Amino acid sequence: VTVADLRFPGTWRRYQELAFAAFEADRAAGRRRTHLVAPPGSGKTVIGLELVRRRGGPALVLVPNQAIQAQWVAQIGRCGGAGLVRTELDRDAPISVLTYQALCRLEDPGAALRELAQARWTAERAAATGESEQAVAAAAADWTGEAERRRSAQVSRIVAAIKREVARGEHPDLALADLLDRGARERVAALRAAGTATVVLDECHHLASLWGYVVRAVLAQLDAELVVGLTATPPAELTAAEGELYEALLGPVDFSVPTPAVVRDGFLAPYQELAWFCAPLASERAWLAEHDVRFAELVTALHDEVPAPDGIPAPLSFPAWVLRRMRERGAADGAAEVPWGTFQRRRPALARAGVRFLLSAGLAPPPGAPRGEAFREPPDLDDWLVLLEDYALGALAADPSPAAAARHEAIGAALRDLGFTLTRQGIRRGRSEVDRLLTSSAAKPLALVEVLACEDEARGETLRACVLCDAERAERRADGALTGVLDATAGTAARAVLALAEDLRTAPLRPLLVSGRALRCVPEDHEALAAALDIAPAVVPDPDADGLVELRPGAGPWTPRDWVPRATAALTAGHTRTLVGTRALLGEGWDAPCVNVLVDLTVATTGVSVRQMRGRSLRLDPQRPEKIASNWDVVCVAADLARGAADYRRFVRKHAHLLAPAEDGVIEAGPSHVHPLLGPFTPPVAAELAVVDRAMRARAADHAGARERWAIGTPYEAVERPTVTVRPVREDLAAGETARDAGVQAALPLSQRAPVLTAAGGALAVAAGTALAGPVGLAGLLAVPGAGLWAGLRLRRAAALAPPLPPLDGAAHAVVEAYAALGELPRDVADSLVVEPRSDGYLRCRLRRGTPEHAALLATALEQLLGVVESPRYLVSRPMRVPGRGPLGMLARVLRRRPPLDERWHAVPDDLARRADRAEAFHRAWSGVVGPSELRFVQRSDAGRALAVEAAGVAAGYEVTVRQVWS
């Protein structure tokens, strides 16, 4: 049997055949790299093996861990090649499956690097001083004290620089391959002697760091004819150097199949993304509140003048500094004052934060500064950070007085409590004790109990859960700041097992802790689980410090290679219905098709880690063809306290690039696919989070609905398009007013809405024109019998057509009509505009047809039109009803020669404001929707800039988010 004799016993799926076509295209073009992306469970291993078969000859497969190594060996055996594979180089075989670690082990290069760094330091100092290198070296040998400490620090920095050069292959005298340890060098030599022609890099997303540099050096020595990269999650968050390395190793992605496509085709289990929200326990909240008070005390203290010794000028007080910055509007170094509009355009965050602070403190903002709703909000944490950074760097850092230094240190200390660092360059974000408390809160294991109790109620004996944590047990005691608040097991897998075992609802699940160190459970489950694992311990051991007991046989080897398969088999059989493990062991490469519930308790937020963990639940279960997978996050929120939304923001980052069906069946990225109330910035209030938790219970039990939302077997385009989701900001509505009253119309196809919108615009023009006839004309009109009633009805009609918020469907219609008039949107695409209602008052606006580029035009323009643009070129107006002003009030305004309706200005979207003809095209479409309107260019006159400032100061009225939607 040879490599060419390998045969896949199944039938190739459509996307697998497309992957092979991409490979053949690469080979026909003479390319030596093939980069394929497919989700976990989609058969990447068999794809890679088929490419090895097609290429023929000796092959090397590199994998990140032993679990994936075992999968390759098993798959080769299923394809008839059991005798063709080796996992050690102790015998001849044409396919070698090794871990990256086996080839990437480096010797300790410390001595060699230090010697090179010493030589470079000597040469650089000799060049700077004009002395010979020998003289510099001799003098340095006698240095002691501070001089020697400085020299040692400089040499250490040079060592770090040389490490980077060696890793990148840029050092003239030292190659990375020279640093491989003896075993790695021998393996590389053996593989080269065997004539290795094909190298498969499985889970190649790991190669954007040190492994990548080492693998690049190894590949250079092997001189393989073909390199294949396989991954489910190409890394997206890369530095420039990492991106360059990854691109050099693998080249661009040749073929990618998105996870939703494989689910829609029926080859992965349909899944739903769910979340459970909890609040910190009372003791934890008290600790958080104390830190919140400290920050509030800092803010209060900043209102006091800084005392200063005689002869040293005191820095300005904080309010005086902010007032000066807002009034003078120069740089902190005293640069010339600039107009407010220019200042707001250059420093929008500082301008907004400054005005908010002044208004909240009862201080008058400078002339020209906006005073609208968006600026009347009290400063939030982000505003304070902007102001404190400007104050610390501009006022305090330049002042030599001890009092200024003390205040600078006080600001730094208060910020450190919240996880921020005040540096000479500004404020940097980091992980704080507040973050750690929220991620490790004792409320999370209790929430885990609720999640699995809910799932047990819905699934019964078919429940197979996997709970992923960052660590098995605490490696150290709780930090001093959290002593007495968090115990030693906080946030660990051990704590999760104990919580499940202590609750009567979840104890029957028999939670089993699986780590790279051991198998553990509570003493009460030891006998049953030992029997299920087919081990016969001599005695039940005593509980360890965590209160758990270890499961191990009485004799013989016992390693993860032994216990992970047994634990997986016990889960599959239902002897335990919950495995609790670490992300490192079970979060990637672990194959357990029975898993139908995944609970993510980790802090991981990168797209690579999140998608890998989700992949554990997506494989089809041969025993349960109707499997529905539920993936849960547990989030701890105290949003009313400083930094209390840190865990929520982590949750948002997890879901930013994760595609899943929302409650209406649209497959989208972002937290709103969990629930529409979950936005990308701040968490909902506590009452709304309770609503979300109730909705999660219902969705967890609605397996039929979950399957229906996926529409399995229906055709798809496999295209991602941006769409806009909006909801009126509740504070913008008058008492008793609904979203519909405020301007959100029912969702209708454009073919039905367009005539309504056009007629509405015309009616508004007539009504408004009549109402503006003036007091003399109106008085004469009122003398005619019935005319007063007619005028009142017309005014009522005008008010109804001029809501406080711009009509969403009208705004979207204006955008697509403008682009259609400019020839940039085909008519059939423009006519495919729909506004669809979601739950909780949200609406989704999208194009059913067209390219992603067409969708991006609508999404970007609508987001700007309904939001606030800091520096617009053109503004358009619309008449607006003032909430609470009825027909009589409007008539009274007309009699006083004042317009019955107010005027609200909106920024013309940037792309449509690039030239006058484009702005005019939008204005025509806009006027057809909202009625009488005016277009103004605002960047060349003081009046125009003032109008732009006024428009920016008005609250947007809509909460607008843009999401990627797959279809």
Positions of the model-derived regions?
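Conserved pre-motif I regulatory segment
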Residues: T2-H35
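Conserved C-terminal RecA-like helicase domain
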Residues: P39-S42, P94, E124-L174, R182-E186, ...
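Conserved Walker A/P-loop ATP-binding site and its immediately adjacent core
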Residues: P40, V46-R78, T99-R105, W211, ...
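Conserved helix-turn-beta segment of the N-terminal RecA-like "Helicase ATP-binding" lobe
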Residues: A67-D92, P109-Q118, E247
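Conserved ATPase-coupling elements of RecA-like P-loop NTPase cores
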Residues: W72, E107-P109, E203-V218, A240, ...
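Conserved RecA-like P-loop NTPase helicase motor core
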Residues: L106, G484-L486, A501-T506, L513-V666, ...
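Post-DEXD/H (motif II) to motif III coupling segment of the RecA-like Helicase ATP-binding lobe
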Residues: A208-L268
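Long, largely alpha-helical accessory region at the distal end of helicase-like NTP-driven motors
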Residues: A296-V355, A361, Y648-P909
